[in-house]
């Protein structure tokens, strides 16, 4: 057996390969791309926005029941990229952790603490042989009472961080470089600019002109810190504004 091959080292989640890699955890990152979707999150001056594709895999499905945006608390929302069942399980756990925090401490959990908690749980999944990492990536948005708008992302390895803008899924690399260029030029976007930057990023990297039914947009703003999902009419207004500008 050559030392470079992954033979034997990807059987167990808890064994390092001779190169110091955990193959099962790396495979979990590949699983995020299985759904074929890309999600983008952008933080503005007084808002945070998440945008993801909405693909209905089957003609007979009721499209109103297909979603990748979830409300965790009144004021924290998330977009899940990756395997749908794993995503729902992680969202359920996040809701439990948020409710638990509220019960224990008497106030809503901040976005960064929720992300840290989910990352801690994911990290344990990379240590124990009887568990497997979840094949999904969670991007959280919310308004922090002290810090203002927040975007946090947590991955199957248990790594988490706050972002000005970030992406996950199939076109993550392309989206990230697009967002880096945008953020370098300007960063204190208004609400409209933030939503439109996120939508432009997604449509540019996928080379698609979206119809309102093909994307989902979730927002939180300082004026209205409750997480809400935009209606198709609202998304259409943003798409029209973008088209007129082009």
Swiss-Prot record:
SMART domains: Proteasome_A_N. GO terms for cellular component: cilium; cytoplasm; cytosol; mitochondrion; myofibril; nuclear matrix; nucleoplasm; P-body. Gene3D superfamilies: Glutamine Phosphoribosylpyrophosphate, subunit 1, domain 1. The modification Phosphotyrosine is found at residue 159. Glycans are attached at residue 5. Induction: Up-regulated in liver tumor tissues (at protein level). One of its GO terms (biological process) is ubiquitin-dependent protein catabolic process. Keywords: Acetylation, Cytoplasm, Glycoprotein, Nucleus, Phosphoprotein, Proteasome. Detected in liver (at protein level). Belongs to the peptidase T1A family. The 26S proteasome consists of a 20S proteasome core and two 19S regulatory subunits. The 20S proteasome core is a barrel-shaped complex made of 28 subunits that are arranged in four stacked rings. The two outer rings are each formed by seven alpha subunits, and the two inner rings are formed by seven beta subunits. The proteolytic activity is exerted by three beta-subunits PSMB5, PSMB6 and PSMB7. Interacts with ALKBH4. Component of the 20S core proteasome complex involved in the proteolytic degradation of most intracellular proteins. This complex plays numerous essential roles within the cell by associating with different regulatory particles. Associated with two 19S regulatory particles, forms the 26S proteasome and thus participates in the ATP-dependent degradation of ubiquitinated proteins. This is Proteasome subunit alpha type-6. It comes from Mus musculus (Mouse). The lineage of its organism: Eukaryota, Metazoa, Chordata, Craniata, Vertebrata. The gene is Psma6.
């Amino acid at each position: 057996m050559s030392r470079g091959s992954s033979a034997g080292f990807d059987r167990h989640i808890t064994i390092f390969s001779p190169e110091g890699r955990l193959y099962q955890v790396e495979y979990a990152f590949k699983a995020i791309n299985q759904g074929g979707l890309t999600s983008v999150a952008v933080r503005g001056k007084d808002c945070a926005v998440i945008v993801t594709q909405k693909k209905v895999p089957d003609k007979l499905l009721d499209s109103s029941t297909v979603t990748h945006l979830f409300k965790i608390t009144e004021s924290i929302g998330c977009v899940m990229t990756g395997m749908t069942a794993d995503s729902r399980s992680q969202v359920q756990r996040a809701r439990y952790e948020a409710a638990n925090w509220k019960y224990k401490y008497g106030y809503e959990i901040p976005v960064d603490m929720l992300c840290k908690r989910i990352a801690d749980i994911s990290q344990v999944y990379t240590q124990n042989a009887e568990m497997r990492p979840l094949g999904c990536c969670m991007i959280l948005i919310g308004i922090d009472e002290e810090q203002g708008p927040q975007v946090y992302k947590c991955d199957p390895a248990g790594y988490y961080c706050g972002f000005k803008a970030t992406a996950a899924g199939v076109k993550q690399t392309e989206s990230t470089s697009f967002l880096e260029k945008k953020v370098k030029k300007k960063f204190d976007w208004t609400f409209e600019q933030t939503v439109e930057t996120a939508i432009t990023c997604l449509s540019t990297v996928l080379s698609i002109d979206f119809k309102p039914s093909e994307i989902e947009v979730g927002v939180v703003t300082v004026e209205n810190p409750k997480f809400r999902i935009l209606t198709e009419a609202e998304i259409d207004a943003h798409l029209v504004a973008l088209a007129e500008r082009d």
